Structures are given as C-alpha cells and as structure tokens.
Amino acid sequence: MKRRLIIAASLFVFNLSSGFAAENIPFSPQPPEIHAGSWVLMDYTTGQILTAGNEHQQRNPASLTKLMTGYVVDRAIDSHRITPDDIVTVGRDAWAKDNPVFVGSSLMFLKEGDRVSVRDLSRGLIVDSGNDACVALADYIAGGQRQFVEMMNNYAEKLHLKDTHFETVHGLDAPGQHSSAYDLAVLSRAIIHGEPEFYHMYSEKSLTWNGITQQNRNGLLWDKTMNVDGLKTGHTSGAGFNLIASAVDGQRRLIAVVMGADSAKGREEEARKLLRWGQQNFTTVQILHRGKKVGTERIWYGDKENIDLGTEQEFWMVLPKAEIPHIKAKYTLDGKELTAPISAHQRVGEIELYDRDKQVAHWPLVTLESVGEGSMFSRLSDYFHHKA
C-alpha cells in the first residue's frame, strides 16, 4: 500500500458523530476535577465529548425535563399544528390554587381562564421554569399531560436518548423518570440547532407575568466573562442541583451538563470549570472539505495520466490546541496503483489522521473524477512504461 502525507492539521481550514470522544486523542489535557453526580462537556459543532463522568448514569432530571417539553412544543410549531401566536385558555389543572402537585414548586403564576399565547407560555416554561406553563401547553397541544408525556418519550426515542424516560411534563419527582448527562447534552444540542424561534428565550434574565417579576435561575447568564446564552437549571430534593449551560467563544459553542451538585452555586461553579477548560484547551477545526482535492495519483491505461482524490464528506473535529502542531493527515491507497477505467466517487483508499504516531480517525478516500479507458496507442505506451 502507498501512504501519502497530505498536510499538517494546523493548515486545514470536519461533522463527526457524537460517539467520538476526546479520549481518542492520546494527548488530551487533564480535565478539571468536578464535584457532582455526573457531568458532560460537549462540543456543539461535532457532538464530541471532551470530558465526562458517570455520563450514562440514570438520574432525576428535575426541571431539565422542561427542555424536552419545549422541544415538543417547537416540533408542533415546525409541523404547523400550532403557531407561536396561538392563544391558550388556561385550564384548572394548570392553576396552582388548591393543586397539591404544585405546592412549593416553580410557577409562572397562571390563573384558570387566563388567555396566553404559546410564545408567552414558552417563556414562562423556560425563564420561570413554570410547571403551570408546562401543563397549559401540554393540554393545548396533546389534550392532556399523559398524551404529551407520550410525545416526549417518542421524541426521546427518535433522538436516541437511551438513558431517558419521562413520566411528567414538568420534571417534578416521579417514579421511573430519569435521564443522563449524556442524553441531556444531546437534547440540548438538538434544541440549539432546531429551535430558532425559542432558543433566544433561554438567555432572557427575567420575566414579568401577572405583575410578578422572576429572574432566570441560571446564574451564569450574568457572568460577563463566559458568554453563556442558555440553557436550564433544575432542582428537587431527589435530584440535587442540575444545570445545563451553553457558551459561545468566537465561532465555537460548548455545552456543559452538571447533575447532582450540592448547591445552586456549586452547579454554576462546576459548569464554569468545564466551559473554561474546554475553551482554553481545545479548538474546532475543519479537517476535510467535501469535493476538495487532497492528492493526485498516477492512473494507468486511461485517457489522462493523473486523477484527483479527496472525500465526499465534510469533517469537523475538536483537537487539543497544544496538539495541533503534531496532527498529520495521510492517505493510503487500497492497492499498489490505479488503473482505468474508473468512475468518480469510487473508494480507492483511506484518509488517516494521526496525533504524533497514534491514529485518531480515518475516512474513505475517493476519486473526484472519472477516467475513461485510453486509446490503443496510449494504453500500449502505458504498458511499456509500466513494465519498464
């Protein structure tokens, strides 16, 4: 097999599956010590996990459940079942008065008979973490909480959230309700990507409704050094203190999930440590461009002498900043040589990415053009040159 050096990765100007983790990079920096039940730091662009602890442990999500509630609402808007301007009449089961389920919990402070838009109920769900807003939306979209929970679990299955099962629309403690830091990072990534109508609400610092002003409980929104613009907090006695925070640093976005911290300040500090570590130590680079040439090879017995090779896919990847000078890309042909005729987009080898001497990723190498069979004269000439 022939191996060709393409270029150092520092000169590349990649979408990788979320199954690829930073641990695949042999020389990843030491992650921070995190004091929580479980945690994840994910790169938004690639879905790569940069560091994690107990990431698939099933835990009580508390109000992080509302991320899925909001996701289902947005899917209903996307499918034109509802619009953000639809007016919802609040029913009795969404009114906290004389409702033991809501005692001591987060509320938007809706009243039975209130007429509220889907947009404002979504703000109440996101900013106030209003359990009453969740119920009002569930009743309007699905005709009841039980039916809405079924929709939530259907979407969890579609998103391959294997550690997740919902029993409520709001996240109050319920037997059988659980998720994981990994699943919630995947869900958060889907929300950021697929909710342009509502994602900006996650950065709103306060909401006034029925004369009551409440602040967003995500304290990192006030940290001017972090550029955090979401997502959500959660807390119950059974869950501890949970937080998902997403921050933008230049063109990069990271998602930090902390579950089971010991206090509201503690969850913020642990998320802050994760985000800063990710921002300081990693960079997101495009390794390969679809259709861009990575090499040229001699082709025998064709109507031309050389053929361009590349990839059919876009590849992004998160790499440790300190390792960029040591990243090399090479390609290997499957056989000793290429012979015509050959079609475009045909696999002829493999592109390999190395960190120092360790292979960290690989992708198919394909032809970027077709080469037909040459004339009798050119094939005869190639024969003698080839055998020489």
UniProtKB/Swiss-Prot annotation:
It is an enzyme of class 3 (hydrolase). Keywords: Carboxypeptidase, Cell inner membrane, Cell membrane, Cell shape, Cell wall biogenesis/degradation, Hydrolase, Membrane, Peptidoglycan synthesis, Protease, Signal. Gene3D superfamilies: D-Ala-D-Ala carboxypeptidase, C-terminal domain (2.60.410.10), DD-peptidase/beta-lactamase superfamily (3.40.710.10). One of its GO terms (biological process) is cell wall organization. Substrate binds at K232. It is found in: Cell inner membrane. It comes from the Bacteria. GO terms for cellular component: plasma membrane. SMART domains: PBP5_C. Pfam families: PBP5_C, Peptidase_S11. It catalyses: Preferential cleavage: (Ac)2-L-Lys-D-Ala-|-D-Ala. Also transpeptidation of peptidyl-alanyl moieties that are N-acyl substituents of D-alanine. GO terms for molecular function: beta-lactamase activity; carboxypeptidase activity; penicillin binding; serine-type D-Ala-D-Ala carboxypeptidase activity. Residues 1-21 form the signal peptide. The active site is at S63, K66, S129. It is a peripheral membrane protein. Pathway: Cell wall biogenesis; peptidoglycan biosynthesis. Its EC number is 3.4.16.4. Belongs to the peptidase S11 family. Removes C-terminal D-alanyl residues from sugar-peptide cell wall precursors. This is D-alanyl-D-alanine carboxypeptidase DacD.
